[in-house]
Amino acid sequence: MNPQPSGMTWNLLLLTWLVALISTLSALFIGEVMGQAPCVLCWFQRAFMFPLTVILAIACYRSDFTVWRYALPLTVIGAALAFVHTLLYAGLIPQPIQPCTATGPSCSGAGMTLFGVVPLPALALFAFIIIAILLIIIRRRTTP
């Protein structure tokens, strides 16, 4: 017998979707409105965040609390990419294995910060971690 999800669980699912939605809209704003071209790692992170927005929206609509089964793998992979990107930004990854080319956008330039303080790769990592935590909480609330 599965535990019945409460209204609080649905609110957590909605919050999870909102985090993904805000992340997606922010990435689109930075790229399309501000005109900042994403680097290679940003594209890969987008490939994992953008589908989460759609998947979690459908899960909210259907009250599908098993969404963690297919959203959590995307989140973990996206978080791993964001972690590598954050290490790259911090200068902890050696130069020879940096994925950005000399002709493409820089992963570690000054334009990769929010308000000149918070690195965008760290924000992406934070968003993926928050989504993962919320999905795990949803799983624990709905799985016996």
Curated annotation (Swiss-Prot):
Q: Which UniProt keywords are listed?
A: Cell inner membrane, Cell membrane, Chaperone, Disulfide bond, Electron transport, Membrane, Oxidoreductase, Plasmid, Redox-active center, Transmembrane, Transmembrane helix, Transport
Task: Provide the Gene Ontology terms for cellular component.
Answer: plasma membrane
Biological process annotations from GO? protein folding
What InterPro entries does the record tag this protein with? DiS_bond_form_DsbB/BdbC (IPR003752), Disulphide_bond_form_BdbC (IPR012187), DsbB-like_sf (IPR023380)
The membrane-spanning stretches of this chain are 10-29, 44-63, 70-87, 116-138
Q: Which SUPFAM superfamilies match?
A: DsbB-like
Q: What is this protein called?
A: Probable disulfide formation protein
Q: Per the UniProt entry, what species is this protein from, by scientific name?
A: Metapseudomonas resinovorans (Pseudomonas resinovorans)
